């Protein structure tokens, strides 16, 4: 296994395209083609973490927070960030940060906290816009089910709690191939009219490459007619934060105590209490 194999798996779970614009996520240090000897997972990449990685023969660190947040202009070892980067490079240790890419996916950090707190009716607090696209294509009637099912299989047509969503309009497609064409139906230089279906499906933007690859692989025509449109709707599967309801209402101080227990921590910071129940 190489570093890129691990990255591919991580980015299937948490695509970097959904990270906040200010963030610095992805592979920060190291070679994507290096063989992985071990993976160390951490909240922050510190000097002690580098030492632990060396001790345990881990040459890939997967960190939640990025050690490099702003551009480095020098590598002199003047501060801890520079020292960590220098030591990682010297010892061929790759560093990968996931941060808000994992914050913003439906099954990410916030969902894990909600599950630990046993929250019900949970949903994204601040849904992102600009994360959805629409594919419109035109398929011969006889091939519609095959093409549509393959697009469903790779993730097209998912809308929150619903899968396999599409819109289908019957119509007629026309074309006339020139002398360099190789039409699947009809012949060169002949005008042809065929019963087709306009197929429309929504998909999340990180899936565009696999969606188009699947369309081209399953559509019978030599030249596939299609359009990709950006959709500005809120995506309630992508966004920052998550909100839900506790199994039962409880006083604020009791909630804080339960929170400490559930999160297995002895210390938390909180805002001023108002002697109200939390649900």
Predicted features, each with a name:
Residues 1-279:
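Hydrophobic structural segments
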């Amino acid at each position: 296994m190489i570093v890129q194999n691990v990255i591919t798996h991580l980015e299937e779970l948490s695509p970097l395209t959904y990270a906040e614009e200010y963030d610095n996520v992805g592979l920060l240090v190291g070679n994507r083609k290096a063989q992985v000897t071990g993976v160390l997972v951490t909240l922050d990449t510190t000097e002690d973490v580098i030492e632990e990685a060396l001790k345990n023969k881990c040459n890939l660190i997967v960190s939640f927070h990025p050690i490099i947040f702003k551009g480095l202009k020098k590598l002199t070892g003047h501060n801890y960030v520079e020292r960590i980067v220098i030591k990682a490079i010297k010892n061929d240790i790759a560093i990968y940060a996931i941060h808000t890419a994992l914050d913003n996916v439906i099954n990410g950090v916030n969902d894990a906290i909600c599950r630990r707190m046993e929250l019900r009716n949970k949903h994204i607090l601040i849904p992102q816009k600009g994360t959805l696209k629409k594919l419109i294509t035109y398929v011969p009637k006889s091939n519609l089910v095959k093409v549509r099912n393959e697009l469903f299989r790779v993730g097209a047509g998912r809308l929150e709690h619903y899968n396999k969503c599409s819109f289908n309009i019957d119509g007629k497609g026309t074309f006339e191939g020139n002398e360099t064409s190789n039409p699947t139906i009809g012949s060169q230089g002949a005008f042809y009219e065929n019963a087709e279906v306009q197929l429309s499906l929504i998909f999340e933007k990180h899936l565009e490459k696999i969606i188009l690859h699947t369309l081209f692989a399953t559509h019978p025509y030599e030249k596939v007619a299609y359009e990709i449109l950006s959709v500005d709707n809120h995506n309630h599967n992508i966004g920052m934060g998550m909100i839900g309801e506790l199994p039962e209402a409880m006083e604020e101080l009791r909630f804080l105590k339960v929170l400490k227990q559930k999160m297995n921590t002895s210390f938390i910071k909180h805002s001023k209490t108002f002697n109200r129940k939390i649900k």
